[in-house]
Amino acid sequence: MKQIFSKIEPGILLHQVFRYNQISKEREDIVPENEFLQLAILKMQKGKTFKAHKHIIKEKITNIAQESWVVIKGSVKCFFYDIDDTIIEEVILEQSDLSMTFRGGHNYEILEKDTIVYEFKTGPYLGIDFDKTLI
């Protein structure tokens, strides 16, 4: 796992990249508990089951949209930005890799025809005018 911290405010986690070939444990929580967008990687064997459950409704306050891309097919070049809007890192994601942006900006260049990604972000989505600002 690659964690990208701010050069402007060291100690602030901006972005994270996890590669498919790094999965080794049965369960790994790969995001710090204080982030709004949470992710665990589960490596499971045939026959594994879970107890049926549902999640508790509770009010939570979020102050930023955090986003993740999972590459399903193809490849993507990620440009990650620091909190001062300067590029801090460039990373290429291949099939089954993922990126997470907690703070700072990002941009993506699609490298292969018919690339497919899943995009996850914290909600609720209130429209583009309340979600992002261009760098």
Regions found by a protein language model. Name each.
Residues 1-42, 91:
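A short, N-terminal "cap"/entry segment at the start of jelly-roll beta-barrel domains
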